[in-house]
Amino acid sequence: MSTGDEPPAEPVVELGPPISEVAWSPELSTQSLEVLILTLEDAEPVWLKPEHADSLRVGLPATARPGDVVLDTLGRYTLTPRVVHSTSWRHEEGRVVLSYIAVVEPPSGLPEDTLARTPVARADLARGDATAPPPEIGVLQVIEHALRHLSWLVQDDPAIGEALPDWRPILERYQPEPFRALG
């Protein structure tokens, strides 16, 4: 029991100076969520892509959880989610883009002038070097990465496997990257 007369104990760890002394400011990166909505039509993956943008981007309020914002976004389009999963991030035009794949039930219809049904094309993965990201990352490359990620999750994560049984034949075509060399 301490009497208060003892000298202060030596610190367990000596902390260095702060990494940054800049509070939030316009010089810091902002973030946005990219919601890549996929569904199945005629046993093939289809991307529900915004008609007037390269991808669906929404803001991320400081108090919100990203997955909840994605679910709210899907609700605005009256889409029924089956799987929502963060898949990647990238730095783009002064902001961090956090990408989520959202697999939804095939919609009977879509609100006019919002989302277009676009067949999913295969793409080479974006490659950087050992200490730097790729110089450019396209949305189709993000979708390719996401589908390879789902290919692994559908086998490894029971919740994903149960949610996407009809996607298994499609996802077999997308070999997870960490395991390509082992095949």
What do the predicted segments below correspond to?
Residues 2, 29-95, 118-130:
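Conserved Nudix-box catalytic region and its N-terminal flanking loop in Nudix hydrolases
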Residues 2-31:
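Acidic, metal-coordinating catalytic segment for phosphate/diphosphate chemistry
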Residues 46-58, 90-183:
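Nudix hydrolase/Nudix homology domain
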Residues 6-10, 16, 44, 80, ...:
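Intrinsic-disorder/low-complexity coil detector
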